[in-house]
């Protein structure tokens, strides 16, 4: 199996990418807020740039929207691949990890983001005991 190619950039180069992404995505009126998360944020070497966006209204085709936005980002971000995911309706674990481990790229409406965080954290912690039981019984993992 082939290894993923990693990119190793200075903090200045990463900051330049963040500025480019923020400018592009903040200019999109349908995006209320965005998180940057994943290896680009957590490690010196990254494989892709993970961006989670919250939309005011969902498009007819979520996949088409994500691919179109990824293509736009690829035109302004180098090096690397940008992986866009929509937070609206995303799995709970994804939403929680984007909030917990990522950082806010921008927000246009802090109340909307605060509501999103409140709902996500509430659902996550309500579900946590069931997740622990599942992991223990199905996978033998103690949490």
Language-model features: where?
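Short beta-strand->loop micro-motif that forms the acidic, two-metal-ion catalytic signature
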Residues: 50-54
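Catalytic core of pol beta-like nucleotidyltransferases
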Residues: 1-35, 41-46, 56-143
């Amino acid at each position: 199996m082939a290894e993923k190619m990693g990119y190793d950039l200075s903090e200045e180069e990463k900051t330049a990418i963040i500025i480019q992404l923020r400018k592009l995505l903040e200019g999109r009126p349908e995006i209320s807020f965005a998180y940057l998360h994943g290896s680009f944020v957590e490690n010196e070497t990254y494989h892709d740039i993970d961006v989670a966006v919250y939309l005011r209204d969902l498009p007819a085709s979520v996949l088409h929207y994500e691919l179109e936005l990824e293509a736009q980002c690829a035109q302004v971000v180098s090096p690397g691949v940008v992986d866009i995911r929509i937070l609206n309706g995303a799995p709970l674990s994804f939403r929680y990890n984007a909030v917990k481990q990522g950082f806010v790229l921008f927000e246009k409406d802090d109340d909307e983001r605060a509501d999103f965080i409140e709902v996500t954290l509430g659902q996550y912690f309500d579900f946590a005991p069931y997740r622990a039981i599942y992991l223990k019984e199905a996978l033998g993992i103690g949490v």
